[in-house]
C-alpha cells in the first residue's frame, strides 16, 4: 500500500509464547466466511474500533520488534482497506505499538501504545490521542507516559480505561499482578498558548499537559489490580490484564488472559472507585485464553482466544461461554485467504458481522488478515441462557 512502510518481527516476548492444551473437543457454531487481506507490511493487526460518525472500522497495526512509525488502517462498509493515519514513533525507542483504540465523545481517537510488546518494557508505554478536525485525523498528542504494558482501551462517558498487562517490566514468577488505569478526559484539555499571526498576537489551543504515572500501583489512576496464576498450565501464560470493555450500565469487564477468565468490576458513580469485582466465568469453558473483547448492547461479551485460536462469547449473567469459531493454529496461505483464524487477538462488532484481527505473533507468514464471521441467524439469547 502506498506510504506503508513494511516491517518484520524480530522479538517475541516469553509471555506470548503459547503452549496450547488439548481440551475436550467442542464443536464451534460457525466459521469465518471470508478474509480481509491487508497490505504488505501490515504484519500484526490488533486493536479495532468503529468510527461512530462514519461506520468505518479503524484497525491498529503495531510495530513489533522493528523500529518505525505505525499505521492505523480503515475498513469501509464494503470491507475495503486503506490508510487512515500514520502514528509517529516514540522519540526514545524509535517505534510505536498501538493496541487498544477507541473514540471518545470529543470525536478524537485514543490509542494505547504498548512499548513493552514493541520491545522496551521499561515503563515506556503511553496513552496517545489522535486529534480529529472536521472528522479527519490531523495530529498525535502524547497524554500519558510511564505505563509498562498498555493494552486494551475503552472509553465510557468521560473516563478512559486502559489495561496494564503487567506492572513489573521484568518477567516475574507467578502469580503476576496486572490491572487497570482510569483517566478523566478533562485531565487532557489543551492549554492555550500565545501565537503570532502577522502583526498580531493571539491565543490558540496548544498541546495538553503530559501526565507521567507512577509505577507499581502507586499512581492514583491505577484503580484495580488482580493476580494471574495460570495454575492449569503451571504459569506458562505470563499474561495478565488484556482486553477491556464496558456494558451500557457501566460495568467494567477485564480479560485475565492467563487464567482464561473475565473479571466484572462494579464501579461507583464516579467511574473509578471499585465497589466489588467477581469472575464471570470459571476458566473451564471452551477457551484457552481471553484476549481482546467487546461488549454488545445485550451485555454479551465477545472475545478472541489467542492461545486456542478461536472466538467465543460469554454471558456474564450466568458465566456460560459458547465457542463461535475455531481453526487449527498456523494455517497455510490458502486457508488464511479463505478466512481462517491465525492467532487472533481482537474482535469488533459491526452490524451482524464479527471482525477478528489475526495478530499472528508466531509464524508471521503472509497473508496478513482480518477474518469476518457472519453472526446473522445465530440465536445467542437461546444459546447463552
Q: For each predicted feature, which ranges?
A:
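A short loop-to-beta-strand structural motif that recurs across blades of beta-propeller domains
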Residues: 70-73, 126-128, 178-181, 261-263, ...
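Bacterial N-terminal signal peptides
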Residues: 9-20
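Beta-rich, blade/repeat-based domains predominating
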Residues: 40-54, 60, 68-69, 89-109, ...
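Beta-propeller fold detector
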Residues: 30-37, 82-88, 138-145, 191-228, ...
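Blade-level signature of beta-propeller repeat domains, shared across WD40, Kelch, NHL, RCC1
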Residues: 343-385
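Short loop/turn segments that connect beta-strands within beta-propeller blades
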Residues: 75-80, 131-136, 184-188, 266-271, ...
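Short, solvent-exposed loop/turn segments at conserved positions within beta-propeller repeat blades
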Residues: 64-69, 117-125, 170-178, 257-258, ...
Amino acid at each position: 500500500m502506498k506510504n506503508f512502510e513494511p516491517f518484520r518481527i524480530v522479538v517475541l516476548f516469553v509471555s506470548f509464547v503459547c503452549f496450547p492444551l488439548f481440551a475436550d473437543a467442542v464443536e464451534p457454531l460457525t466459521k469465518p466466511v471470508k478474509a480481509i487481506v491487508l497490505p504488505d507490511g501490515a504484519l500484526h493487526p490488533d486493536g479495532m474500533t468503529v468510527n461512530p460518525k462514519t461506520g468505518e472500522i479503524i484497525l491498529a497495526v503495531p510495530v513489533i520488534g522493528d523500529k518505525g512509525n505505525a499505521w492505523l488502517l480503515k475498513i469501509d462498509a464494503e470491507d475495503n482497506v486503506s490508510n487512515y493515519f500514520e502514528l509517529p514513533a516514540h522519540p526514545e525507542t524509535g517505534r510505536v505499538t498501538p493496541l487498544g483504540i477507541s473514540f471518545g465523545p470529543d470525536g478524537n481517537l485514543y490509542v494505547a501504545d504498548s512499548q513493552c510488546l514493541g520491545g522496551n518494557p521499561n515503563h515506556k508505554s503511553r496513552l496517545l490521542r489522535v486529534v480529529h478536525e472536521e472528522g479527519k485525523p490531523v495530529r498525535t498528542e502524547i497524554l500519558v507516559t510511564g505505563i509498562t504494558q498498555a493494552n486494551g482501551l475503552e472509553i465510557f462517558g468521560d473516563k478512559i480505561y486502559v489495561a496494564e498487562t503487567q506492572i513489573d517490566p521484568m518477567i516475574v514468577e507467578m502469580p503476576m499482578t496486572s490491572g487497570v488505569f482510569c483517566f478523566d478526559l478533562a485531565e487532557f484539555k489543551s492549554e492555550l498558548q500565545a501565537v503570532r499571526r502577522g502583526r498580531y498576537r493571539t491565543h490558540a489551543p496548544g498541546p495538553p499537559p503530559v501526565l507521567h504515572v507512577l509505577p507499581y500501583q502507586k499512581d492514583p489512576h491505577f484503580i484495580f489490580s488482580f493476580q494471574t496464576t495460570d495454575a492449569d498450565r503451571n504459569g506458562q501464560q505470563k499474561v495478565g490484564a488484556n482486553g477491556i470493555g464496558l456494558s451500557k450500565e457501566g460495568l467494567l469487564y477485564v480479560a485475565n488472559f492467563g487464567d482464561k477468565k473475565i473479571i466484572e468490576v462494579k464501579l461507583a458513580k464516579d467511574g473509578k472507585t471499585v465497589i466489588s469485582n467477581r469472575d464471570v466465568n470459571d476458566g473451564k469453558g471452551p477457551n484457552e485464553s481471553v484476549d481482546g473483547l467487546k461488549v454488545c448492547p445485550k451485555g454479551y461479551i465477545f472475545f478472541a482466544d489467542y492461545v486456542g485460536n478461536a472466538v467465543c462469547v460469554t454471558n456474564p449473567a450466568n458465566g456460560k461461554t459458547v465457542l463461535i469459531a475455531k481453526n487449527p493454529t498456523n494455517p497455510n496461505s490458502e486457508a488464511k485467504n479463505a478466512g481462517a483464524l491465525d492467532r487472533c487477538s481482537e474482535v469488533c462488532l459491526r452490524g451482524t458481522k464479527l471482525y477478528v484481527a489475526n495478530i499472528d505473533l508466531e509464524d508471521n507468514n503472509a497473508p496478513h488478515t482480518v477474518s469476518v464471521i457472519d453472526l446473522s441467524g445465530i440465536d445467542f439469547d437461546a444459546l447463552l441462557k
